[in-house]
Amino acid sequence: MLGRDGVMPLDHFRRLIDVHLIGTFNMIRLFADKARHLDPLSEDGDRGVIVNTSSIFGLEGQIDAVSYSAAKAGIAGMTLPLARELAREGIRVVAIAPGIFETPMVTSLRETAREQILDAVAFPKRMGKPREYAQLVRHICENNMLNGAVIRIDAGIRT
């Protein structure tokens, strides 16, 4: 928030909140409006599941990332209330809070920065792979008992 070049512009904070939090909410509301009119997919009466991406930064915060952390915390924070509200429509809501994954953003960091991040990882001592994230999404979609939860997938990292 306070850097070498001065205070963070408020527009920077607003932009990250708008993209990550408000953008997520917008997609949820549009999907929910369409999904509630679908025929149930099973005897449970489910009409779909919304899987959002939060972040461990949203659960624990991260230095130099207050706006990103706040946006991702908002996604985690609205998961249970949305699950409760959309339950009557047969729509589940779950959020995933990933740790450090092999993404272009992370792999573009300097090697020393990546090593520093990996020092905080418990086990396995590596970045997550996109397929591991996808496996969790699939499990969420297949298991109707998962609803209203924020699931960490972070190899025990604590920042």
Task: Please annotate each region the language model reported.
Residues 1-14, 33, 37-44, 64-67, ...:
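Conserved mid-core segment of classical short-chain dehydrogenase/reductases
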Residues 6-26, 51, 75:
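Catalytic Tyr-X3-Lys loop
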Residues 17-18, 112-132:
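Catalytic Tyr-x(3-8)-Lys segment
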Residues 28, 71:
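Active-site helix of classical SDR
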Residues 33, 84-85:
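Alpha-helical segment proximal to the catalytic Tyr-Lys
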Residues 55:
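Residue(s) in the substrate-gating loop at a strand-loop-helix junction
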Residues 87, 92, 145-149:
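Short, small/polar-rich loop/turn modules that mediate ligand/substrate recognition or access, typified
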Residues 129-153, 158:
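C-terminal substrate-recognition "lid" of short-chain dehydrogenase/reductases
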